[in-house]
């Protein structure tokens, strides 16, 4: 399994729509960087956030109650205030169409990590298609700003030595084609 370079990421995005919209260079002046890098792509977080609150005493991933969240639109302010020790969901500006022979792994940006803001995203499986739901945790005891429409994490692409027998699309992945922030789902 090989790590893919900028030239491959660019080709797959421009010719096959792997990342859309696609920024062909790294943008980093006066913003948290995003766009193409040497061996990855820095994704941007949108302006819609879902803050987990304490309306109910329990989060159950098998029976998730959307009333446990508050939707926040940060498009006017340009940022979202994540309270101390809080958790929120967001989504990428970019839409992904993964090739059948490629898996992507997403890692948080050091700019946020050095402020105690941890970003988690599960792997983008072969033939996954959709916007990416991003999990954001503020591990500090202070409120923190998360900037809308700026970089939030970096995606690296690993191409397999052979094509998988069954992709995420083939097995009817429950988050296939997701748009916006997608809450936990259990197939029934």
UniProtKB/Swiss-Prot annotation:
Reaction catalysis annotation: dCTP + H2O + H(+) = dUTP + NH4(+)
Top EC class of this enzyme: hydrolase
Residues annotated for dCTP binding in this entry: 109-114, 154, 168, 178
Source taxon at top rank: Bacteria
Pathway entry: Pyrimidine metabolism; dUMP biosynthesis; dUMP from dCTP (dUTP route): step 1/2
Pfam families assigned to the protein according to its UniProt record, in alphabetical order: DCD
Enzyme Commission code: 3.5.4.13
Protein keywords: Hydrolase, Nucleotide metabolism, Nucleotide-binding
Active site positions, chain numbering: 135
Biological-process GO terms, alphabetical: dUMP biosynthetic process; dUTP biosynthetic process; nucleobase-containing small molecule interconversion
GO molecular function, one term: dCTP deaminase activity
Summary of the function given for this chain in its UniProt record: Catalyzes the deamination of dCTP to dUTP.
Subunit and partners: Homotrimer.
Record-stated family: Belongs to the dCTP deaminase family.
NCBIfam families: dCTP_deam
Protein name in UniProt: dCTP deaminase
Originating organism: Helicobacter pylori (strain Shi470)
Taxonomic path: Bacteria, Pseudomonadati, Campylobacterota, Epsilonproteobacteria, Campylobacterales
